[in-house]
């Protein structure tokens, strides 16, 4: 999924067309209402080329889209991305805050999916004060989002994320009405992350969040890929078990397990 952010990292027509989907990032639960900063010492020539920026200079991502000031503005962007990407699914991601008000606003744009990011998710680069004190916990956010979409008869897929780590978390989210679950930190941990929380320093000792050549050499991508595959496949099998013991196997298989199988090869 191509994440479309305010400063338009790596936005080209080709990238939009070759993505599986495009997600307009309005907010993130660990730092709602805040932008982002990639320090210049992490902007290597390789990163600069990918992001269309100058090597060695800080890259600042604004906290909001300057061209989105109304429902119509957001709808225009969704329509534009749908056209440029030749029909790729377009989603909108929000931090779990004013959920009902936010859903009312963004549903006007008629996205294909909405991602609600609840408190409990993580990034090693968020201020602790904000990360630990803002946004609505994921499960409560899911309940409110599902309720709103159902009450307003909105045919928009609901993706939930934020602190969901293991199969029982995924099964609970599906049972509560999520159409899909997005995972981030859990995937990084499966690959190699040991949560040293040095992501913003460029000194990750296991080589996951760094551009240092020596540190990067410690990350064995073939092993990490295998571990991630094992994590996804094990989660899939455990979701099947939850589906069987709750008598929902048929609906879960058609809705979740078949697509999941496609992204978790053996």
Give the location of each predicted region.
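Active-site-facing alpha/beta catalytic cores
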Residues: 1-80, 84-107
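Extended, intrinsically disordered, low-complexity segments
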Residues: 30-34, 152, 205-240
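Residue-level signal for pocket-adjacent positions within structured domains
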Residues: 38, 42-45, 60, 194, ...
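Short coil/turn segments at secondary-structure junctions
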Residues: 58-65, 129, 219-226
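Amphipathic, soluble alpha/beta structural segments
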Residues: 61, 65, 169, 237-243
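Glycine-rich phosphate/ribose-binding loops and adjacent secondary-structure elements
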Residues: 65-216
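C-terminal extensions of enzymes
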Residues: 192, 219-259, 263-266
């Amino acid at each position: 999924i191509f994440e479309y952010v305010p400063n338009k990292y790596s936005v080209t027509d080709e990238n939009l067309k070759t993505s599986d989907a495009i997600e307009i990032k309005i907010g993130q639960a660990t730092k709602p209402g805040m932008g982002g900063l990639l320090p210049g010492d992490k902007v290597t020539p390789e990163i600069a080329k990918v992001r269309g920026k100058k090597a060695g200079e800080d890259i600042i991502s604004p906290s909001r889209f300057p061209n989105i000031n109304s429902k119509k503005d957001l709808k225009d962007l969704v329509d534009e991305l749908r056209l440029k990407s030749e029909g790729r699914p377009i989603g909108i991601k929000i931090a779990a805050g004013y959920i009902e008000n936010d859903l009312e606003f963004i549903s006007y744009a008629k996205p294909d999916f909405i991602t609600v990011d609840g408190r409990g998710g993580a990034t090693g680069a968020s201020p602790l004060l904000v990360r630990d004190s803002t946004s609505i916990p994921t499960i409560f956010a899911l309940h409110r989002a599902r309720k709103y979409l159902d009450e307003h008869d909105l045919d928009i897929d609901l993706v939930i994320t934020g602190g969901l780590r293991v199969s029982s978390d995924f099964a609970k989210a599906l049972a509560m009405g999520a159409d899909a679950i997005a995972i981030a930190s859990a995937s990084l941990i499966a690959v190699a992350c040991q949560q040293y929380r040095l992501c913003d320093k460029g000194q990750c000792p296991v080589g996951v969040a760094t551009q240092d050549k020596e540190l990067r050499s410690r990350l064995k991508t073939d092993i990490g890929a295998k571990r991630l595959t094992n994590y996804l496949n094990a989660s899939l099998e455990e979701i099947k078990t939850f589906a069987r013991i709750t008598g929902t196997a048929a609906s879960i298989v058609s809705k979740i397990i078949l697509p999941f199988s496609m992204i978790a090869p053996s």
